[in-house]
Amino acid sequence: MKWIFLLLSLLIYSCQELPKKYQTPEGKKILEKYKKQYVKGVVILDDKLKEKIPKGERYLIIAVMKEGSSRPVAVLRVKNPDFPYRFKITGKHKIVPEDFIEGKLMLTARISKEPTAGFKRGDLYGFAQAQAGDEDVKILINQVFEEKEK
């Protein structure tokens, strides 16, 4: 009996009409932005860099930036990942909840001994361009960060 009540409740709530503010053309645009607030793909490590992966504890940090911005919109940190690493970055990874993962994006994947922001000497990294809502982004980690002499 409880299951029937639960099922009926679920059906009633799921069949509710969309709130009026989302039925307008502007409201539909907002809903569409929310639907595409993600990016999915895989991080691949270049075979030439496998020997350079830090020993012991290491982190994979994937940052998502809007095109033309130097500030990430979202960040995913993974401790001791295996490669290739499949990822999905969504609204729950956003730094500022009011920001949107939208439009053209630049993704950076970095392997580091530290889970902090910013590149450190010896970090391995790679870049990829994507659009919000893309599901087959490939980020090839194929570079080593070396600090420039001052």
Swiss-Prot record:
It comes from the Bacteria. PROSITE patterns: PROKAR_LIPOPROTEIN. This is Uncharacterized protein aq_1241.
